[in-house]
Structure formats: structure tokens, C-alpha cells
Amino acid sequence: NDLDKDRTHGDFQNQQAVYYQDAKTGFGGQNGSKNFCVHYGYADNSGYANGPLPYIYFGDGVARVVDHMYVTMTTYLANCVANGNGLTAPAGKDDWVKLVAIGYDEDGKEVATRPEFYLVGAEGNILEWTKWDLSALGKVVKIDFNVTGSNDNGYGFSQPAYFAYDDVAVRF
């Protein structure tokens, strides 16, 4: 894991870096840790994004409530939202990028609720670790994560579909 607060470095070479830096430890993870996870992936109706979504799952197949996790933008996404690149324009005042959680029960059926979290939107850009409540999913075995947004370059969602997460809290 890495951190990079220089948005001029925020290209695909820093797709796994976060913009956040803890003031006490100097590391990029939530609560000052060195480690965090980065996921990439999206699905839309463009026909260009048809791969599997990034996910987390319980390998033992037992459903549990994922209470919350902390999320933030990667430096790559932060740079493109602010400055654009060859594939996307900078985010405008009405643009948005959000995460959508899609839960699955022990039978592999999708649960009814899909919690959303805006990384970019009316509230601003999320450059620090922020708690995302996932408890509305109820007991799940697997959660897919879709990164979607309003920027479309004619080939579907055009912002980098990366997000970082840390400190996943599970109820046992």
C-alpha cells in the first residue's frame, strides 16, 4: 500500500495509492495503519464493462452482518476528478461518483437493499477515510462493489473505478 498526496502523480501508476496521510503515523491507512485494500471494477449498460465486480466474501459460507467499513478515494481517482486525463473530463459541480454494495445471502440470492456511498457529489470529494454503514444489507455471505458515476466518455463510466477500504467491521 502507498500514499501519494501529489495529484500530478495521480495516474494509473498510482492506482493503488491513497491521497490520505495520517498526521501521527505518516501512513495512508484508516486509523494510521500501513495497510488497506484497493478494489477496481464497475458495471454499467455500456457493454464495455462486463467483467466480475470486486467483492469480499466469507469463505466458510456462513452469512454475517457487515456493520461498516471505511472508504476513501485513491490518488488516481482524486487526480482525474480534479484534473481529468486523456479518457475523462474533470468532475463538474453536478457530477458524482458512488459506491454501491450488492449483498448475497447463503443461497446466493441478492438481498433487497443496496447501500450507496458518494465519493464525489454534493457533499464534496471524500479524500479522508469515512465510515460507510453496510448494516442494512443484513446477513450476507458475499458483497459485490460497483463503482459508478455520471462521467461518461461514450464508452461508459469514464472516471477510474478504484476505491480504497479499510477496517471492515463484522458482527459475529
Cite the ranges covered by each PLM segment.
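A generic structural micro-feature
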Residues: 61, 91-95, 159-162
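Short, T/G/N/S-enriched strand-turn elements that build extracellular solenoid repeat scaffolds
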Residues: 54-58, 133
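Terminal, low-complexity interaction segments
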Residues: 99-172
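Extended extracellular/luminal ectodomain segments enriched in beta-structured repeat modules
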Residues: 61-68, 139-140
